[in-house]
UniProtKB/Swiss-Prot annotation:
Quaternary structure annotation from Swiss-Prot or TrEMBL: Homotetramer.
Keywords of the record: DNA-binding
Any one biological process term the GO annotation gives: DNA replication
Gene responsible for this protein: ssb
Record-level Gene Ontology MF annotations: single-stranded DNA binding
Superkingdom in the source lineage: Bacteria
UniProt-recorded name of the protein: Single-stranded DNA-binding protein
Claim: Amino-acid biosynthesis is one of the keywords in the record: no
PROSITE patterns hit by this protein: SSB
Start and end residues of each SSB domain: 1-100
Amino acid sequence: MMFGYFVGYLGADPEERMTSKGKRVVVLRLGVKSRIGTKDETVWCKCNVWHNRYDKMLPYLKKGSGVIVAGDISVESYMSKDGTPQSSLVISVDTIKFSPFGRNESRSLSLLEESSAQTTSYDNVSLGFEGESLDAEAIADKDMYAGYGQGQQYVSEDVPF
């Protein structure tokens, strides 16, 4: 059995189905881009989320959502509508997370425009995971550990021995 991690975008909203044995499965269509030479190619994977796993997350998964999926990999063979044999990559999902590189195009575009308007050089500016501007000169003086561990209280019942 193979296990792998895949990062991509959902090609459709999740579909909920029931198997012939009455088991619930949610199917995600995941598009994973790969580059071969100068050509971009998208590989489509069928991701099966079994039972009630990730039910709280599912309402937030929509077409275009960026996700990171980990799970067991298998290949499924089938006949296409025109009668030719086809195969599909199937992932039985073990974990799924939102990708920090997901498409939030309107927010990303506005942050990029703000960033380019404020500076003429891109050498010292980049965007962080939440889209905040990371200016190397502005954060050089800051103590990165300031406030670390503040506000934590330990109670004797918390200690396991």
